[in-house]
Amino acid sequence: MSEESDSLRTSPSVASLSENELPPPPEPPGYVCSLTEDLVTKAREELQEKPEWRLRDVQALRDMVRKEYPNLSTSLDDAFLLRFLRARKFDYDRALQLLVNYHSCRRSWPEVFNNLKPSALKDVLASGFLTVLPHTDPRGCHVVCIRPDRWIPSNYPITENIRAIYLTLEKLIQSEETQVNGIVILADYKGVSLSKASHFGPFIAKKVIGILQDGFPIRIKAVHVVNEPRIFKGIFAIIKPFLKEKIANRFFLHGSDLNSLHTNLPRSILPKEYGGTAGELDTATWNAVLLASEDDFVKEFCQPVPACDSILGQTLLPEGLTSDAQCDDSLRAVKSQLYSCY
């Protein structure tokens, strides 16, 4: 008998092995840092991230989740947990609270976060309500451009716009570059009417701002507002009480003065609609990026929520603004506030 046939005869096949004898499945690939050397340095200086301690820090956060929230349905992958550590400058306790808030917000606002996928928001994406500019600013921040005038309230409720914003942020935060550099928001309020502005009352404002500040692992480095009408004073009066001082100081109101905008965002990265040299505003490219991510969003946001997740508190629900009647009263107050701007 040949050596080959003897080998075949004496080597057990996988099918013949008992369950206990089966080789263990291969472990998923570990975290591989995609940051450039410059971004590694930036993360060290600004976020207290030390490459030599990175995986130790991730494991520490993972252990805290397992110990303090054993029933929390969440990813514990290195890359996912790093988002929260970076957003809280590697403070374990604050990163853990941010992670819990992130999931609590998703549970407490199902109108926004349930079934959150690009195909469910085709109308919003087609409207041009928001996009991400193709070029980053000098600090490496992606620029999210929001244009409320593109929204027609009779077509769909304001919560669909909010869903599109969170969809975009979820996609952006997958990038380690964005986790380190953060984002900039460019909001164009040209043509926003009183009736349209009244849809953004305190109930919605507090929830959106609460999530962005305390329930989402994103670093908002600046908010540039252009072409704001007089009623924006009323809109900002609604928003400001909910803003932390650090975030409030990052709001810049430029009016129609594009030269003022260009001192912060160079013309080379802006479309011609904002006095830039980067061509016309392109919404199709970013829409295509989102639509190509459909499967990822279905996996993350379109699955049944485990019953055990009900242990999460409603940590960021606006106090005293939970009933429909209270929301109506709030909107009446908003309209009075906005009328006073005229």
Swiss-Prot record:
Q: Where does this protein have compositionally biased stretches of type Polar residues?
A: 8-19
> Has the keyword Hydrolase been applied to this entry?
no
Alphabetized, the UniProt keywords read: Transport
Q: Does the keyword Hydrolase apply?
A: no
Q: What SUPFAM superfamilies does this protein map onto? A: CRAL/TRIO domain, CRAL/TRIO N-terminal domain
Please state every residue range assigned to the domain named CRAL-TRIO: 117-282
GO molecular function terms noted in the UniProt entry:
phosphatidylinositol bisphosphate binding
**Top-level lineage group:** Eukaryota
One of the record's GO cellular component terms: membrane
User: What segment(s) does the record annotate as region Disordered?
Assistant: 1-31
Job of this protein? May act as a protein that binds a hydrophobic ligand.
**Alphabetized PANTHER family for the sequence:** ALPHA-TOCOPHEROL TRANSFER PROTEIN-LIKE, ALPHA-TOCOPHEROL TRANSFER PROTEIN-RELATED
Q: What is this protein called?
A: Alpha-tocopherol transfer protein-like
Instruction: Report the gene name.
Output: TTPAL
